Amino acid sequence: MASLGEIGGLPMQVSPLLSRRRLLGVAAAVTTVGLVTPAPAISYAPRSISLYNPHTGEWLRTVYWADGHYIREAVRDINWILRDHHTDEMRPMDAGVLDVLGMLREQLDTPEPFLVVSGYRSPATNMNMYLHGEGVAKHSYHIKGMAVDLRSERRSLEQVREAAMSLQCGGVGYYPRASFVHVDCGPIRHW
């Protein structure tokens, strides 16, 4: 991923997910029109996220991207609500997973917040969970700030899973017994 520099003292990355979508959109326009569409055809519609962290009681509804740029304060707030709630450690979340969450919200067509089961996990928290057989990967995308486990109050887990899989933007894990869906911005796969 290409670096966007620092947002609020936190490094940001350009999400290849929407870039890939933009490329497909431009390719479709070229096929339909027969001409290369100028740059203004690329959508700069605002992207928003709504999150509730039941572990901390915090909630957030914010536009995190507008006018072609990530919004520093919004990204900082998202990073905080997605922090490791066991240790209060925060790290910059990958822009790709923010965009997955934003697209998932749009796909589900709901303004309600996602309930955050797990966002960033410190290496110590992840290792503790791994050693206690909690079903986490030893080298989890959560450690890299590239994954979020979530659920929705108004949408079934199946609806969330199907919507996430339809995006074709990363990993989607379905955990009905634990009542959450895992989304990440790694390779496209599902389980």
Predicted segments with their positions:
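Catalytic cores and adjacent binding grooves of peptidoglycan-active enzymes
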Residues: 2-4, 8-11, 42, 47-52, ...
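N-terminal secretory signal peptides and thylakoid transit peptides that target proteins
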Residues: 7-34
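Sec/Tat signal peptide C-region and signal peptidase I cleavage site
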Residues: 37-41
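Active-site acidic/histidine clusters and adjacent loop/turn architecture
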Residues: 67-117
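Structured segments of extracytoplasmic/periplasmic soluble domains
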Residues: 81, 100-111, 132-135, 153, ...
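Acidic helix-start/capping segments at beta-turn-to-alpha-helix junctions
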Residues: 113-127
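Charged, often glycine-rich, active-site loop that binds/positions anionic groups
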Residues: 123-138
